[in-house]
Amino acid sequence: MKTILLTGAYGQLGVVCEEYLNKHFKVYSTARTAKNKRFLLDISSRQSVKRVLENVQPDIILNLAAMTDVDRCESEPGIAKKYNLNGLINLCDGFDGHIIQISTDYVFDGKKGPYDENDSTNPISVYGRTKLLAEEFLINSNHNYTIIRTNVLYGFTDNAKASFLQWVINSLKDSKSIRIVKDQWNNPTSTNSLAKFILNIASTSTYGLYHYADEGLMNRYEFAQLIGKVFHLDRSLIQPILTSELNQIASRPMLSGLKTRKIEEELGIKPPLVETCLLEFRKMLKS
């Protein structure tokens, strides 16, 4: 049985990946704060990474550890680079196995989305630039790598910060009005859906750059409306606004989203509809 070192195991994607991968691999789950039998690992520390790699000797590294707060990245670019680029470099130092790196649609400028793997990158935020630098490091290295770009991840977990899905559901259940942007377009992606794809990549030793996102390009307001519809909540509480009204520090790609033709043609994998994934979450909550 192959061994996987999983970083960022405490995040919303990490929790789900841990569950899926444990059935097929020997998984060593790590996080910056050691909880629930996970091992302590700060990927920004070269010594810490070296010690863990020597002890675990993994065949595969699944790197989910990152600084993903887009506005904080903009305010603290040094820290963003420390985790989003230098952390990956530390993981690769002396490692000769398969590294799986999660990336983002924020490597694009959001002017002409949705994008495929051959489209030119042009990040407009520190977060996007640091994630692109990480991609470029892997592509120019001699490592066996898989880069998976995704967007607008959502799911359910008790162990991580509430996702967009949980926030919308909880707000509407509490009869709270919420303001959602109507001018940012993506195809929202279920953590369950992405975790299954990652399992496939790890199991088949598939290398390269791939886009993975669920099927259904929509703006955030439409996504919130769809959540309200699927979970039978009061959608009149959802108010559409423009991104400019939020006065956010970092710029966001407006017309983004990811095309998945490459994985469909090369790997025979077709992502599910966004609504299908939401219905699965509703069923899961009822059980």
Show which residues each predicted segment covers:
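Rossmann-fold cofactor-recognition segment
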Residues: R32-Q47
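Mid/C-terminal beta-alpha module of Rossmann-like enzyme folds, strongest
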Residues: F197, T204-I249, M254-L255
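NAD(P)H-binding glycine-rich loop region in Rossmannoid oxidoreductase-like domains
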Residues: I43-Y83
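NAD(P)-dependent short-chain dehydrogenase/reductase
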Residues: E136-N186, S193, L199
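N-terminal Rossmann NAD(P)H-binding glycine-rich loop of SDR-like oxidoreductase domains
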Residues: K2-K23
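Conserved C-terminal active-site "lid" loop/helix of NAD(P)H-dependent oxidoreductases
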Residues: N219-Q225, L242-K286
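NAD(P)-cofactor binding segment of oxidoreductase domains
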Residues: S75-I100, E135
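Conserved Rossmann-fold NAD(P)-dependent oxidoreductase catalytic core, especially the SDR/UDP-sugar
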Residues: I89-N122
